[in-house]
UniProtKB/Swiss-Prot annotation:
It comes from Trieres chinensis (Marine centric diatom). The keyword Magnesium applies. InterPro entries: DNA-dir_RpoC_beta_prime, RNA_pol_asu, RNA_pol_N, RNA_pol_Rpb1_1, RNA_pol_Rpb1_3, RNA_pol_Rpb1_3_sf, RNA_pol_Rpb1_clamp_domain, RNApol_RpoC1. Binds 1 Mg(2+) ion per subunit. Binds 1 Zn(2+) ion per subunit. The gene is rpoC1. In plastids the minimal PEP RNA polymerase catalytic core is composed of four subunits: alpha, beta, beta', and beta''. When a (nuclear-encoded) sigma factor is associated with the core the holoenzyme is formed, which can initiate transcription. This is DNA-directed RNA polymerase subunit beta'. Its main location: plastid. It is an enzyme of class 2 (transferase). Its cofactor is Mg(2+); Zn(2+). SUPFAM superfamilies: beta and beta-prime subunits of DNA dependent RNA-polymerase (SSF64484). The keyword Chloroplast applies. One of its GO terms (cellular component) is chloroplast. Belongs to the RNA polymerase beta' chain family. RpoC1 subfamily.
Amino acid sequence: MLQSEKEFDYINIKLASPLRILQWSYRRLPNGQFIGEVQKSETINYRTFKPEMDGLFCERIFGPSRSFECACGKYKLIRYEGLICERCGVELTESRVRRHRMGHINLIYPVAHVWYTNSRPNYMALLLEVEQCEKNLNTSWQILRFSLPGIYDQVLRPILLSDHWPDSSIDEYLKTICKDFSTIALESSNIWAKKSKAWYQKIFEIYQELLYAKIETIYQFIEFIDNIDLTKQPTSVNFIFDYLENEKILDLMNPISLTNEITASQDPAQIDLVDPSRDIFLFLNTFPKKQHKELFRKLIRKSNTVKSLDDRIKRIKLASLAYFIAEDEISYYGLHWDLQQYRRSRELGFTAYPLKPEPKPKLQNRRYNTPKYLLRMTPTYLIGAVLIKKELEDLDIIKEIQRTRKFIVICSKILHKEKPIYHFLRWFRKWELQRAYKLRDQAIKRIRILENLLATGSNPAWMILTILPVIPPALRPMIQLEGGRFATSDLNELYRRIITRNNRLLRLLEIDAPQLIIRNEKRMLQEAVDTLIDNGKRGKIALSANNRPLKSLSDIIKGKHGRFRQNLLGKRVDYSGRSVIVVGPSLRLNECGLPYEMALELFQPFLIREMINQGLASNMKIARNLIEQNEAIIDPVLEKVLSNHPIFLNRAPTLHRLGIQAFEPILVQGRAIKLHPLVCSAFNADFDGDQMAVHIPLSLESQSECYMLMLAPYNFLSPANGEPIILPSQDMVLGCYYLTVSNIKGLLGSNQYFASLEDVLLAYNQDKIELHTAIWIRYTDNYIEPLNFKKQIQLNDASYIEIYENMQIRRDKDGNKIVQYLQTTTGRVIFNYTVQTTLNLLS
């Protein structure tokens, strides 16, 4: 078997496309047959103990169970290597190929990846600009929560509205909506009763976005019945329908750009998306109930001649019109309202969609009935992962990035109340400030996702799975135990559920089963895929036969015992050690205390080489003997080796890149690693028994990277948010406060005079003064303006002393300054001396 070694600088992780998943598993046999799809849920034959063909352990897909032996037994020798059996189709090769050959499952119905629908933040919600998407994208995968009782039982089969509805169905529905329906519908119908000359004279534009296609429909009333007495006008169905058609209410061929209209508008605050629509359909409700039945029939028949870009759009729009005519609570605020709100948020995004969702208008006290018949018009492809996939496919990543960037700039200007944006968009004042900040943060998260998708060349629609990869069988083994029993991986059970439900869904579609059963099967398929990817992510944990949680793919790779931390990051390596950490406040940020015994063992090869170079030993054996005897000549050589060789310190778990940092080692006694307390926050370490690992960089390149990139002082800012990560802790702040306190009186050695900082430290070490003793120290560097003059003392040599509140200045007879003393405390001297020593300010 050929093996190739390739050098690479980095690994690029991205979404896998359906084509890439097929490339992982699809292979073509010499007879022209394509293999790779797992079609059966069986694993092995319990009589022959051989893998089932096209099953989860199929030898034709994943390779032979025994090296150079086909499934049927026709070929068994190594001389047939590379041959494909013409009887069973198994390639004669080594059995270890079962560790990397993959298969796939063609899903009958697309399913959403649970990592992106139930994540925090919700990636699909950010991409589609739908708030609270995690509540909408549940296992039934209805992106629109209709909030209607019994919706799952009512939506049975899609019915084309363009077809002629049975009269019996229309009669039954109209009896429902017309029951107790008065001629005067709402307050607006009082005008009808009073025979007003002009009901409305108003020009407005109403934008109604519909879900499945990128088309906006404009409903217009232009010069509505100007100065016309409604009582003198014919009220026949023909008049109503002709009026609706003439006024272009039913014109479905008027797509407009809502974004452009709002941008061009001089006063966006006047755009009303609710009341004008209600006014239109309240007008329809002013006609007597006996005319509704005929009006409905005419609308349905006329729909055959209505031009539309797509039959689906026509169906939804006419259904919406029927809802409004019904003036029902659920019809007005049910399906149509959710369609409108979702499309508005999707098309306009956060730029023009109100930051505070529009509340549903209040209705009058009436009896409402659920229009079950109209609910059945909802096509099956308007719900589920198919719809989400369609919306994600329509995303133009480059345009979305540009639009989101503009919104972030505009939102920032509004939050800072910059002119003229803030005053031009007066309607922003109605929005809650916290919500504005929240949406700007969401836009920032969204642009990060979009830029990552663009950089990796990924399509967001790949978050919806149409082809499910099957990992190699050697990674999910089935082992035979004593007594004929088998121990198998949980992944086999999870894959078996998916294949079983997928095949059952295919069978239901072939026999044209009721939609209720098909939808339930789609839900079960989605749940099975969710459990395979991440069991428990949805909230419900799938259990095995003995009530044990099944181990999913996510459980295998995450956690302390997962593949990364257990087998990759936690491997034992050479030139490494481990010990408990203790505090070392006297160290610098770039230093750490390395125990002598550990340094002697870790740096032994470097130590031997240096001893040979200095002539202390003639060969490795003599040098090793000197080290074992712990001769005194070893110490200076070891210090020289350590002076130019950094080390890595790592604390598990390594959750971010600051979990591994470089330090310059300092030899210390004992067996514990000393660490500066300020660098503990990056490691998330404390001194209650934590352990850290030491690693030695061997090559010159790695050592140069330590000095240039990974030293602790160079990791001052957090890579996550740019905030300082090296900050003084509470005990440090309290210690600095206690060190510099100056209001304690009556202490040992008060009011003594000192010539320098070193004299103060010497007196403190000899216990002649205390930490908070008030002292006078000579100060000669810079002139300080004295304050609060108290008195002046004349001396015999004509000089005099000026005494201030915290200063004493001695001057000669001409007024020239001879010397000055500052009043301070011993603790402040220690603090000042430490700072100057660290900054190399002392001469």
